[in-house]
From Swiss-Prot:
ATP binds at A9, Y10, S11, G12, G13, L14, D15, T16, S17, A35, G116. NCBIfam families: argG, PRK00509.1. HAMAP family: Arg_succ_synth_type1. It is found in: Cytoplasm. Its EC number is 6.3.4.5. PROSITE patterns: ARGININOSUCCIN_SYN_1, ARGININOSUCCIN_SYN_2. This is Argininosuccinate synthase. The keyword Translocase does not apply. Homotetramer.
Length: 401
C-alpha cells in the first residue's frame, strides 16, 4: 500500500522536529521543507536533523531576498505594527512558506501539507488560509492540535527518547522563531506577564544596560520607499542591508518589545520580540514620509494604513485583494519617499536626528521665526477666524444668543 505523502513546514525547532517522527510513526512519508528567511547559522544543521527525525527528504531553499523584497518591504512601506507594537516578524514569513509548501506538494504529488502550529496560536490560521487561497484542494495537517503531548516538558522528553536534537530543554524551554525581520520568543518563564524576561531569552540584542556607553549614528538612504543605502554604502540586495542593520542596532539594545497581544482565537498572550533592524527602518521611513507628504495624505496614511495592513498580515489574509489594494496605495506614496534619514542608537533607544529629501515639503522661509520669515501672519488671522467659525457658532447657541 502506498504511503501517504506530506510536505512539512520544518523549522528545526522542538515542535516540527518531533512532528517528523510522530507523522512517520502514523504511517506518513515525510518530506520537510525549510525556507531560509534569515534564520542564521542554525540552518546548516537542518537537513541532517530532519533525516535523523525520520524524513525521507529535506528541502532547504534560500528565500532571503524574496522575503525581504516581497514581504518585509511592503510591510515597512505600510508602517504596519500589530496593536501599535509588533512588527510582524514571524507572521510575515508564513504566507511565503505556505506558497512554497503548495508548490512542492504539487511537484511531488503529496496528499497533504503540514505545519507545527498549535490549536490556540495564530500560525494555524496564517498557514491554512494561505494554502487554501492558493490550492483549496490540498488538505492541511496540524499534528500539534491532536497529538498526546500535554506540555512542553513532555515534548522535550519525547525528543530526547528518539535522540532528536533540539535547543529547548526543561531548564530553557523557550519557543524561538527567528528570521531576517526579527525574533519571536515565547513559553517558559515568559508566560508570567509580571516577570521581567530573563536575559537568556534574548537572541540578537544586547541588554541596554550593557550596550556601549557612546551612541552610534546611522544614515539610511531611501529610493522611492526602498532602503538602499546604509551609512553611504549601497546595497543591491535588500536582505543584506537588513541583516547589517540588525547587527548594528542589536548591539545597542534597540528593538526589544515586550507586550501582551490579542491572538486571533481570543486569548491574550505575552510575547517577546527582537527586531532591531526593522524598528530602525520603521522610525526612519515614518520620519521621511512626514517630510515629503502633504498633511492630508500623511494623516490619512497614518490613521488607516498601518493598522489595516498589520491586521491583515496578523490574521492570515496576505493572499487577498485587500492586501493588493493596500500595496497599490503604499507604492504610490513611496514614489515621493526618496531621501536620507540620520538616526542615533543609544542603550535601547532609536531617535531621528536629521532628515533630507529632494522631495521635501519643508520650507525654511515659511517655518522660521528669524528675519528670513516670509509667512504672511496677517493671513493667519483671517484663517483662524474662518477655521474657528463652527466653534464660534456653537458657543453662541449654547449661550442662547
Amino acid at each position: 500500500m502506498k504511503k501517504k505523502r506530506v510536505i512539512l513546514a520544518y523549522s528545526g525547532g522542538l515542535d516540527t522536529s518531533i512532528i517528523v517522527r510522530w507523522l512517520t510513526e502514523k504511517g506518513y512519508e515525510v518530506i520537510t521543507y525549510t525556507a531560509d528567511v534569515g534564520q542564521g547559522e542554525e540552518l546548516s544543521e537542518i537537513p541532517e536533523k530532519a533525516r535523523r527525525a525520520g524524513a525521507i527528504e529535506a528541502i532547504v531553499e534560500d528565500l532571503k531576498e524574496t522575503f525581504a523584497e516581497n514581504y518585509c518591504l511592503p510591510t515597512l512601506r505600510a508602517l504596519a505594527l500589530y496593536e501599535g507594537k509588533y512588527p510582524l516578524t514571524a507572521a510575515l514569513s508564513r504566507p511565503l512558506i505556505a506558497e512554497r509548501l503548495v508548490y512542492y506538494a504539487e511537484k511531488f504529488n503529496a496528499d497533504y501539507v503540514a505545519h507545527g502550529s498549535t490549536g490556540k496560536g495564530n500560525d494555524q490560521v496564517r498557514f491554512e488560509l494561505s494554502v487554501w487561497a492558493l490550492n483549496p484542494d490540498i488538505e492541511v495537517l496540524a499534528p500539534v492540535r491532536e497529538w498526546e503531548f500535554k506540555s512542553r516538558e513532555e515534548q522535550v522528553e519525547y525528543a530526547q527518547r528518539f535522540n532528536i536534537p533540539v535547543k529547548a530543554t526543561k531548564e530553557k524551554p523557550y519557543s524561538i522563531d527567528r528570521n531576517l525581520w526579527g525574533v519571536s520568543i515565547e513559553c517558559g518563564p515568559l508566560e508570567d506577564p509580571w516577570q521581567e524576561p530573563p536575559q537568556d531569552a534574548y537572541q540578537i540584542t544586547q541588554s541596554p544596560e550593557e550596550a556601549p556607553d557612546e551612541p552610534e549614528y546611522v544614515t539610511v538612504g531611501f529610493e522611492k520607499g526602498k532602503p538602499v543605502y546604509l551609512n553611504g554604502e549601497r546595497y543591491e540586495e535588500q536582505w543584506k542591508l537588513i541583516a547589517n542593520l540588525n547587527e548594528i542596532a542589536g548591539r545597542h539594545g534597540v528593538g526589544r518589545i515586550d507586550m501582551v497581544e490579542n491572538r486571533l482565537v481570543g486569548i491574550k498572550s505575552r510575547e517577546i520580540y527582537e527586531a532591531p533592524g526593522a524598528m530602525v527602518l520603521y522610525e526612519a521611513y515614518r520620519d521621511l514620509l512626514s517630510l515629503v507628504l502633504d498633511r492630508f495624505t500623511f494623516h490619512y496614511f497614518l490613521t488607516h494604513i498601518p493598522h489595516e495592513y498589520a491586521k491583515l498580515v496578523y490574521e492570515g489574509l496576505w493572499f487577498t485583494p485587500l492586501r493588493e489594494a493596500l500595496d497599490a496605495f503604499t507604492n504610490k506614496i513611496a514614489e515621493f519617499a526618496t531621501g536620507e534619514v540620520r538616526l542615533k542608537l543609544y542603550k535601547g533607544s532609536v531617535s531621528v536626528v536629521g532628515r533630507r529629501s529632494p522631495n521635501s515639503l519643508y520650507v525654511e522661509e515659511l517655518a522660521t521665526y528669524s528675519e528670513k520669515d516670509q509667512f504672511d501672519q496677517i493671513a493667519g488671522k483671517h484663517f483662524t477666524k474662518v477655521w474657528g467659525l463652527p466653534l464660534k457658532v456653537l458657543g453662541r447657541v449654547r449661550k442662547g444668543k
